[in-house]
Every structure is written in C-alpha cells, then in structure tokens.
Amino acid sequence: MNWYGLLVLFHFCLSLSIALRIIYSRRSSSAALAWLTVLFAFPLLGVIVYLLIGESKLGRARAQRQAELLAFHDAFADRFLPPQTVPLCEVRFRQIAHLVQADSGYVATGGNTTRLLTDTDAILQAFVADIEAARHCCLLEFYIVEGTGRVEAVLEALMRAAGRGVRCQLLADALGSSSFWRSSWPQRLRAAGVEVTEALPVGLLKSLWVRSDLRNHRKILIVDYRVAYTGSYNLVDPRLFKQKAGVGEWVDAVLRCEGAVAQELAAVFYGDWAVENEHNLSATLEQLTGYVDEMPQGAPETPGGALLQVIPSQPGSDMALVYDVLCNALNVAQERVVISTPYFVPDEALLNTLILTAKRGVEVVLILPKRVDSRLVRYASRAYYQPLLAAGVQLRMFDGGLLHTKAVVIDGRFALFGTVNMDMRSFYLNLEVSLAVFTPETVTAISALLDGYLAGSEAVELKKWQQRRRVQRFIERCVRLVSPLL
C-alpha cells in the first residue's frame, strides 16, 4: 500500500473513531447530528474542526482546578454568607431556587437592594462613584474591556483606588478583550498597583489541547463585598465599540445590587481568579477572612429587600443549569413570558418548550435586535421564526441599535437577568452568570425595561414572513443544520 492509501486509511479510521465518540457522548442529539453532518460532508476539514472545537477541552490542569471550585464555594458560604433560609416566594418559583442550590450550591439571599441601570452614562457614573468610595477591594471581571472613550474614567478611578491601598483586581477575557491586551492599559494599570489577569489565554499550540473558543463571558463588578453589578454590559463605550459592524450602538442594562448577593458574586469572581492564577484556594479563603475581619459590619438586610440567587455556569460539565432553569420557568408560566436576547439559536427542546408554552394560552413575546453582528447567527435565528409564529409566539424586532440585554420575565413575578444568550454556546460552553430574581418589585423594573424595548420594536407577521424569497429560506435551512454548533 502506498502513502496515499495509508493516509486514506488513517483518515477513515480517525473519522470513524470520532463518529463513534460523537454517538456515545452525552451531547444533545441535535448537536451530535450536526457534528456528524460536518464530519462526513467535509471529510478532512470536518476532522480538523472537530479536533479543535468539538469538545469542551479545558486542559487537564484547568479541569482539575475547576473540580476544586465546588468545595471552595461551600467553604466560602460557610464563612461569609448568611444562613440559608427558605425562599419567600411562590411555590412554583421556590422549586427553581431549590434546583439552583442543588446543582450549584448557591442559595437565594434576601434583603438586597437593587437599582436597574439602562443608560451607559448612568452605568459608568455608578461604576466610578462606587470605585471612588471603595475602602477594601474592587473586583472586575468582563468579557470585553476597551479602554477608550468614557471607559477611561473607570480605569483611571481603579488606578486611584489602588493608590489608596484598595486591592483592585481585573480579570478580562483573552479573546474578547484582545484590543485591551494589545494596548498600553495593562502595563499602566499594573504600574498603578492594579492586579490584571488574562482569562482563558489563547495560542496556536494551546488550541491543540485546550478549546480556544471557550470564553469567559461574565460581566461582574464588586466593591467591598457590599455592592455588585452584573448584566449584559461589557466595559466598552458603545459610541466607539464596533461602529463599523453596521448594527448601531449596543443597548445594555445592568443591575446594581447591595447586600449578600454581592458576596455570592465575589465567590464566582474568586473562583475564576484562582483558576487563572493557580492561586491556592485555601490561601484565598484565609486572605478573605483577614479582609472581612478588618471591615466594619455592613448594613443589616433591608426588610422586604430583593430575593436574588446567583446562577453561574461553565464548561466541563454535562449539566446546563441556566438552560434547565429557563425551561422550568417556561413550564410554570401561566400568563405572560417576555424574553430579550441578542442571539437566538435554540435547540429542539427549547424551541418546543416555547411553542408549547404559547399553545397552552400563555402570551409569549420574543424581542430580538433587527440587526446583529453575526451573519451566521442571523440566518440561523430566522430558521426558527416560522414555527414560533405559527404557534402564536409574538416576534418583535428592535430597531434602536443592537439590543444586547439578556432577560426573561415570567408572569411579572420572576425574572432571569444576566449574561446568557439564548444559544447553545451560552448554555453549554461559556463561563456565564445570571441572577434569578424572585421579588416582584425588581421584576417589575425589568419588565418595564422590556416593555420599553417593545415600544421601539416592530412585529413580524406570519403571512409576510412566509413570502420571503426562496433563496433566503434555503440559506436559513442550510445554516440550521449546524446551528447547534454556533
């Protein structure tokens, strides 16, 4: 047998072994079929692509480190978090709280005060004000950081805080914040005393054993373990960010929280920080104990304050906690569901859950941006419009920029708010964080925000949608075949 024959045989054996691995893996059937399609439709390319991004490869050291995080959180909760109480909310939503606690260890905490920020100027001014008032620590974790425009004020406030002796730590994703890492900002921040770390570093050789498209998509800012922010907002100036993409300014929202939930989000941050820096988690706990002992007692829980629960998610697990929570919330909806997401690429199970929710008489409203910055995602999303519209789901296209807010409101009494898009990448691959909101007052604020988006949106009509060109339908259906991989 010549060399060509040996190569063909090797390729066949490798493809067969990969196909068997796909079939016997615990991934969804739609994702498995999509990978098999890519593998055999593009013989050599399919093998290469699968070896690079086909599995949630964290690397051995990182995977072992991730396994330590659950014990770290348990110890963190025992030392720093208030005692667990039964969530005071409706039984149907209390069951969601129990699900999150059982799978993640994070409990619902009451007595928090919240403020929803929906304007970039208000968000950045609040960031700067809290950093300027910091006495002990400033913890920042973002997918995208760009030190331009109005963001410069935040980074400068961080440097001033470090100069006052406040411990300031910034964790930014290597790929999402690539322009930040190429700039002079990391050096300037470190020179001022700010600890700066790259999350999930990428490299040509590294991608052979660590999947390079697994990203840290979290957006968190914590000050003195007392105040915390999370939501869809990256640390960028929308007036300058991706202006050549033709989608307009990004539209985001952030929830400012004060109370025990800030300590829960601190646990998420410190776990990520320790993994990236190979810090000893026990030493981190001891260090935190010293900080907390030196801090004055915080304000007591606000009577009737917001009941919130942190829902972290990360790769390297067969579970998709946020996905499970979302499906459970849809299943217990009785009156109205409103969803805002920039990227909508559901799997068959989530699609069917949305359809069945609408068919049983619940008003289901899905708000999407009219223009997105990914052509593949745009075509993949459109492939799902017709079955949703036929089932009675209301589709609204927001035309005031790229709507980037990720929120779900159920019956005006429960909400999910955070960083998670409605696609399999967010559910299964990225490091994400969401808040489950159980208090009607905070849910009402989020609901009012989504109603404001609805006022600036136009409806998609089924009859008009069915009249689109055949070539568009063909492209949408082709892209849908690989949509579980997007």
Regions found by a protein language model. Give the residues of each.
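Short, solvent-exposed amphipathic alpha-helical segments in soluble enzyme
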Residues: T353-T357, A383, G452
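Catalytic-core elements of nucleic-acid end-processing and repair enzymes
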Residues: K406
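CN hydrolase (nitrilase-like) catalytic-core segments centered on the catalytic cysteine
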Residues: A380, G392
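Helical hairpin unit composed of two closely spaced alpha helices linked by a short loop
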Residues: Y343-V365, P369, S374
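Active-site donor-binding acidic/aromatic loop of nucleotide-activated sugar
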Residues: L395-D399
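N-terminal localization/anchoring segments of enzymes in phospholipid and broader phosphate metabolism
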Residues: M1-D324, N328, V332, V372, ...
